[in-house]
Swiss-Prot record:
A GO cellular component annotation in the UniProt record: plasma membrane
Topology relative to the membrane: Multi-pass membrane protein
Keyword field: Cell membrane, Glycoprotein, Membrane, Transmembrane, Transmembrane helix
Protein's name according to its UniProt entry: CASP-like protein 5B3
Higher taxonomy: Eukaryota, Viridiplantae, Streptophyta, Embryophyta, Tracheophyta
Record-linked Pfam families: CASP_dom
Entry's family note: Belongs to the Casparian strip membrane proteins (CASP) family.
Main localization (coarse): membrane
Annotated InterPro entries: CASP_dom, CASPL-5
Source domain of life: Eukaryota
Length: 154
C-alpha cells in the first residue's frame, strides 16, 4: 500500500509541496507589505510560521523533484518518519499562527473597529494574509495525513 496520494517522490506529493510554498510565500508577502503588522505579535508569528513552512516545503519539493528525476524511492521508514514529524509540527504551528492572526483581524474589523478609526492600517492585507495562511494549512494538513497514512502502511 505504498500508493498513497501525496507521498514523497510522486507528482501529487510534489504538487502539494509546491502549493504549500506558493501560498505560504503569498501569505508572507501580503502580511509583510501591510502597514503596521510588526506592532502585533500574532502577525509577526504568522510571518515566522509561514516562513518556516516555506522553507520546509521548498526543501521537500526539491527532494520530490530530485526523486522524480532519478526514479528513487523515498518510502524508507526512517525518512517517512522524519517527514511525518516535520509535517505535523509545521501544521500545528501554521494552524496556531493562522488562528491567532484571524482572531486579531476579527478583533480589529468587527469588535473595536480599528480599521475604520485608523484607515492607515492595512486590514484588507491582514485578511488576505490570514486567508492564504489557512489555505496553506489545508495543504499542510493534507500532506501530514498522507504522510501518516504512508508511515502506517510501511
Amino acid at each position: 500500500m505504498k500508493d498513497v496520494v501525496g507521498s514523497p517522490g510522486t507528482w501529487s506529493g510534489m504538487s502539494l509541496r509546491v502549493s504549500q510554498c506558493v501560498f505560504a510565500g503569498a501569505s508572507v508577502v501580503a502580511m509583510a507589505s501591510a502597514y503596521g503588522f510588526s506592532n502585533y505579535t500574532a502577525f509577526c508569528y504568522l510571518i515566522a510560521s509561514m516562513g518556516l513552512q516555506l522553507l520546509w516545503s521548498f526543501g521537500l519539493a526539491c527532494l520530490d523533484i530530485y526523486s522524480l528525476q532519478t526514479k528513487r524511492d523515498l518510502h524508507n521508514p526512517v525518512l517517512v518518519s522524519l517527514f511525518v514529524v516535520g509535517d505535523w509540527v509545521t501544521a500545528i504551528l501554521s494552524f496556531a499562527a493562522a488562528s491567532a492572526s484571524a482572531g486579531v483581524t476579527i478583533l480589529f474589523e468587527r469588535d473595536v473597529h480599528f480599521c475604520r478609526m485608523y484607515p492607515q492600517l492595512s486590514c484588507g492585507r491582514y485578511e488576505l494574509s490570514v486567508i492564504l495562511a489557512f489555505i496553506t494549512w489545508s495543504f499542510i494538513a493534507t500532506s501530514a495525513v498522507s504522510m501518516f497514512w504512508l508511515l502506517a502502511s510501511l
